[in-house]
Amino acid sequence: MRVTDFSFELPESLIAHYPQPERSRCRLLSLEGPTGALTHGTFTDLLDKLNPGDLLVFNNTRVIPARLFGRKASGGKIEVLVERMLDDKRILAHIRASKAPKPGTELLLGDDESIHATMTARHGALFEVEFNDPRPVLDILNAIGHMPLPQYIDRPDEDADRELYQTVYSEKPGAVAAPTAGLHFDEPLLAALREKGVEMAFVTLHVGAGTFQPVRVDTIEDHIMHSEYAEVPQEVVDAVLAAKARGNRVIAVGTTSVRSLESAAQAAKSDLIEPFFGDTQIFIYPGYQYKVIDALITNFHLPESTLIMLVSAFAGYQHTMNAYKTAVEQKYRFFSYGDAMFITYNPQAISERP
């Protein structure tokens, strides 16, 4: 399959630069997987679409202020984007500089350049950085870091983004991008869903900067997926198996929840799904056999991205591309701060190719 098969025209004006004032008031495009039928509504329509006993699976990762600015002690300006925290002193990061720093390079970080760090090793495209500071890494990032808004939002981060670019249920710091489908859930909607009898479970996948990297090959089968850390604990496994046993649906909130659950299913030796704690490089594209997910809540993704490929594998290529064409025509808002989709599984998707 060609990467260009997953391209579509998107006017710049449809890229959302700010979220809706009220999280759950975004628009919702519903796609019926088996038929391709589309319906238009608002996000709170989920209350009518979900049944008592259905299981929503959320990703409870929390975005860290992962973008740092500063300079090398020798003078050149740098921008650091944390990929992951290795421990209380070290990070793995992307570094933008006119000349890549060598091991041993001293870095001065923060607006006042008061934080001292050393680039200690290089791992492919990533740099290992150790802070020379008594505080834990997370405290340093909270003090001097900027929220790592995606490039397409195309504005400096603001103080408000520290909360707006987090889900209301975020709990475990470690992501450099929000699991954006979850941004639409507010406390009143969560309470209403619970009252209806909708079950909830929480996985953790720390979204890495690789999620924004373009696919740089022509044929998608040649793409090497970036690695991200995921946790699917026993209580999530139990909730999934219980929902399946009683004939209810498992609904993933966002592609990161999909990738977590499907990673746990792939690694399972005897049951449908088993606990999973580790790095995943799962790459889902048309032809993939979904094992766990019955429905998906997700935002609108970038052209030619691995995420639109994941959606195509779930809903079917033609249904997905038609939905995106309709969304553009109907002026839905796209990407991280944009509108959402509710998609049910298309069993024919596995045999469909572009």
Swiss-Prot record:
Pathway: tRNA modification; tRNA-queuosine biosynthesis. GO terms for molecular function: S-adenosylmethionine:tRNA ribosyltransferase-isomerase activity. The keyword S-adenosyl-L-methionine applies. Keywords: Cytoplasm, Queuosine biosynthesis, S-adenosyl-L-methionine, Transferase. One of its GO terms (biological process) is tRNA wobble guanine modification. It catalyses: 7-aminomethyl-7-carbaguanosine(34) in tRNA + S-adenosyl-L-methionine = epoxyqueuosine(34) in tRNA + adenine + L-methionine + 2 H(+). Belongs to the QueA family. Transfers and isomerizes the ribose moiety from AdoMet to the 7-aminomethyl group of 7-deazaguanine (preQ1-tRNA) to give epoxyqueuosine (oQ-tRNA). HAMAP family: QueA. This is S-adenosylmethionine:tRNA ribosyltransferase-isomerase. It comes from Salmonella choleraesuis (strain SC-B67).
